[in-house]
Curated annotation (Swiss-Prot):
Regulation: Allosterically activated by GTP. Inhibited by UTP.
Annotated family: Belongs to the UMP kinase family.
Protein name: Uridylate kinase
Record keywords: Allosteric enzyme, ATP-binding, Cytoplasm, Kinase, Nucleotide-binding, Pyrimidine biosynthesis, Transferase
Pathway info: Pyrimidine metabolism; CTP biosynthesis via de novo pathway; UDP from UMP (UMPK route): step 1/1
Keyword Membrane: no
Residues that bind UMP: G54, D74, I135, G136, S137, P138, Y139, F140, S141, T142
Major subcellular location class: cytoplasm
Organism in which the protein naturally occurs: Streptococcus thermophilus (strain ATCC BAA-250 / LMG 18311)
Region (Involved in allosteric activation by GTP): 20-25
Length: 245
């Protein structure tokens, strides 16, 4: 077997990825299909963490715009991410993959609290760790959660597994047929160009901690494994990448 490019990764999934064609809620067959892809990678000895958004169940910003207190709206979203994490953990366990959910808010009846040292021990024992409930504070996105946790666990890369999006373009390819896809970008170029891969806080965290971002289409079977083993899939963002004009 080829040597993997990344030995410890954090996979960032949107909540909508769990909703399937419905677009909202949780579609269990879809979750099970994603879990199977992740399990195949775990079987290769790769250490895996997951962060899953909650947009399939709740979105804090629109709720706040409709009049709800923003802090309460964001805490509600954190509960949504935990629901997604528990469903994904169960799907992985059904495949025989030892998995732990760690939450930034104490929910000891259903998950472990987030403790960095414990997470690292789980990786050493071959377990997948799913980080839920954001960073435990309002106003921070799950993108920022992914970047922060990736830095804390010394992840080699953040895999931005997108639902039907195959990389980063200089314009919206759905609106502009001449849009150009980048194979490689630097973190600095992403920030300068205002490319909306992840939010600004997460982008800066990734740059400062020298963490690669790989944006790719998760709907293509086997893509997660291809990225980890170094195939040129999607767009790679790093501090060392050469910008494709």
């Amino acid at each position: 077997m080829a040597e993997p490019k990344y030995k410890r990764v954090l996979i960032k999934l949107s909540g909508e990825a769990l909703a399937g064609e419905k677009g909202v809620g949780i579609d269990l067959p879809t979750v099970q299909a994603i879990a199977k892809e992740i399990a195949e990678v775990a079987d290769s000895g790769i250490q895996i963490a997951l962060v899953i958004g909650g947009g399939n169940l709740w979105r804090g910003e629109p709720a706040a715009e409709a009049g709800m207190d923003r802090v309460q709206a964001d805490y509600t979203g954190m509960l949504g991410t935990t629901m997604n994490a528990l469903v994904m953990a169960d799907s992985l366990k059904q495949l025989g993959v030892d998995t732990r959910v760690q939450t930034a808010i104490d929910m000891k009846s259903v998950a472990e609290p987030y403790i960095r040292g414990r997470a690292l021990r789980h990786f050493e024992k071959g377990r997948i760790v799913i980080f839920a409930a954001g960073i435990g504070s309002p106003y921070f996105s799950t993108d920022t959660t992914a970047a922060l946790r990736a830095a804390e666990i010394e992840s080699d890369a953040i895999l931005m597994a997108k639902n039907g999006v195959d990389g980063v373009y200089n314009d919206d390819p759905r609106k502009n047929a001449d849009a150009v896809k980048f194979d490689k970008l630097t973190h600095v170029e992403v920030i300068k160009r205002g490319l909306k891969i992840i939010d600004a806080t997460a982008s800066t965290l990734s740059m400062d901690n020298d963490i690669d971002l790989v944006v790719f289409n998760m709907n293509e079977p086997g893509n997660i494994k291809r990225v980890i083993f170094g195939e040129q899939i999607g767009t790679t963002v790093s501090n060392k990448a050469e910008l494709r004009k």
